[in-house]
């Protein structure tokens, strides 16, 4: 069988290794320039490829496996559909491959606009108190890596994005969950209906024997429950924020824990609050960095949309200084601007997002700079003892960084460098 890999990102690289190892013919078509290391890998394996665009050569195959970020209006995809060429992506392709090798783990799949990585990490952590589980998906561990590394367990926890779901052919988890739905990725999805439909694809192929665990407080989810055939179980918000360990005591974590707790109990396992004590919080999500002369610094680089920034701001009073940065996602910033006006002392804007949000900032005290470094230094010079300076960008990182992790690490390095030169109480 001949495969075309449309896009050569993290997931398709792992699929490439799997396909070559199993003797399949592969062609790689990358819309951007391939890294020299990727070219070397392809040449060493005798695999033909093209870069800086897709040609009709990509159509000379039986199946096209699409990298999640490839746009749905891609001309090669349109032509492939006209020619009835099969189109799939990692999550459903790998699930079929699991079945072929006789591995049928109990699959828990989670999607949502914010909080996915924290929630799947919590589920993975809680399950491993009782059984052995694996974690993969959009959290940064390609599902195909489980095939390549021969990793097996009875339970598989997956973080799934709207892009992955859009391209998936037939993905059927035992338990699916949608945490929340807010306007997001509208620079990729043409409208909210398209985005919501992609999210609900997580439950499209579930039967009445499967389970759909959902947030009952989310209007988009409630309005679309009729699409779900699986047994519907709402999150159980039967606890207060004070129940959470100190290191997890943030408002957005309540939703994450409610989802994980409900899923664990739905599976028949006991949940104990003590299980959360040794859960290591993921970096770049409301991550406390340090304190300098009474000013606290938080790194929330993972906040790449408006609602994530709103949730971060809600954890503080009116002594907050906020840094927003990166590339916006074609969002309506009305609500975010209202919250900023109420709770943020000074807003620093860095990069392209400034032009998107500026029309909403009437009455907000803000300034624009070219770099996060300038924002940190300027805000620190204006901050008073008891204030907080937080990076919660609200935009993608690709204008200046490889990913949100690199951006967060850079911010932390800037803060620690600032501490070395300014700390009066160290």
From Swiss-Prot:
Disulfide bonds: none annotated. The keyword Phosphoprotein does not apply. InterPro entries: Mur-like_cat_sf, Mur_ligase_C, Mur_ligase_C_dom_sf, Mur_ligase_cen, MurD. The keyword Zinc-finger does not apply. It comes from the Bacteria. GO terms for biological process: cell division; cell wall organization; peptidoglycan biosynthetic process; regulation of cell shape. Its EC number is 6.3.2.9. Gene3D superfamilies: Mur ligase, C-terminal domain (3.90.190.20), Mur-like, catalytic domain (3.40.1190.10), NAD(P)-binding Rossmann-like Domain (3.40.50.720). GO terms for molecular function: ATP binding; UDP-N-acetylmuramoylalanine-D-glutamate ligase activity. This is UDP-N-acetylmuramoylalanine--D-glutamate ligase. Cell wall formation. Catalyzes the addition of glutamate to the nucleotide precursor UDP-N-acetylmuramoyl-L-alanine (UMA). NCBIfam families: murD (TIGR01087). Keywords: ATP-binding, Cell cycle, Cell division, Cell shape, Cell wall biogenesis/degradation, Cytoplasm, Ligase, Nucleotide-binding, Peptidoglycan synthesis. ATP binds at residues 112-118. The gene is murD.
């Amino acid at each position: 069988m001949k495969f075309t890999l449309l896009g050569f990102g993290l997931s398709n690289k792992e699929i490439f290794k799997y396909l070559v190892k199993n003797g399949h013919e592969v062609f790689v078509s990358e819309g951007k320039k391939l890294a020299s290391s990727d070219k070397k890998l392809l040449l060493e394996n005798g695999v033909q490829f093209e870069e800086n665009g897709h040609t009709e050569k990509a159509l000379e195959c039986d199946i096209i496996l699409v990298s999640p970020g490839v746009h749905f209006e891609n001309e090669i995809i349109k032509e492939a559909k006209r020619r009835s060429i099969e189109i799939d992506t990692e999550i459903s392709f790998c699930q079929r491959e699991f079945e072929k090798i006789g591995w049928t783990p109990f699959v828990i799949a989670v999607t949502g606009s914010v909080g996915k990585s924290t929630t799947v990490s919590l589920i993975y952590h809680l399950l491993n108190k009782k059984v052995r589980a694996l974690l993969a998906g959009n959290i940064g561990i390609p599902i195909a890596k489980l095939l390549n590394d021969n990793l097996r367990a009875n339970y598989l926890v997956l973080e799934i994005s709207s892009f992955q779901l859009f391209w998936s052919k037939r993905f059927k988890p035992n338990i699916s969950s949608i945490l929340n739905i807010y306007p997001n990725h509208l620079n990729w999805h043409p409208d909210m209906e398209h985005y919501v439909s992609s999210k609900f694809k997580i439950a499209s192929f579930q039967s009445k024997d499967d389970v759909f665990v959902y947030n009952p407080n989310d209007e988009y989810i409630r309005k679309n429950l009729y699409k779900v055939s699986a047994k519907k179980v709402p999150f159980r918000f039967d606890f207060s924020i004070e129940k959470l360990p100190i290191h997890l005591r943030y408002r957005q974590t309540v939703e994450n824990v409610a989802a994980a707790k409900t899923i664990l109990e739905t599976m028949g396992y006991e949940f104990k609050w003590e299980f959360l004590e040794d859960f290591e919080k993921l970096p770049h999500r409301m991550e406390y960095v340090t304190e300098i002369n009474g000013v606290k610094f938080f790194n929330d680089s993972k906040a790449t949309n408006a609602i994530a920034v709103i949730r971060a701001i809600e954890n503080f009073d009116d002594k907050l200084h906020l840094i927003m940065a990166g590339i916006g996602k074609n969002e309506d910033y009305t609500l975010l601007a209202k919250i900023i006006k109420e709770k943020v002392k000074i807003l620093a804007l860095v990069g392209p997002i400034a032009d998107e949000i500026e029309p909403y900032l009437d009455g907000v005290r803000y300034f624009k700079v070219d770099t996060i470094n300038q924002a940190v230094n300027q805000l620190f010079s204006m901050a008073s003892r008891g204030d907080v300076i937080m990076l919660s960008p609200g935009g993608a990182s690709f204008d200046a960084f490889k990913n949100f992790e690199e951006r967060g690490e850079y911010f932390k390095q800037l803060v620690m460098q600032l501490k070395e030169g300014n700390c009066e109480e160290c």
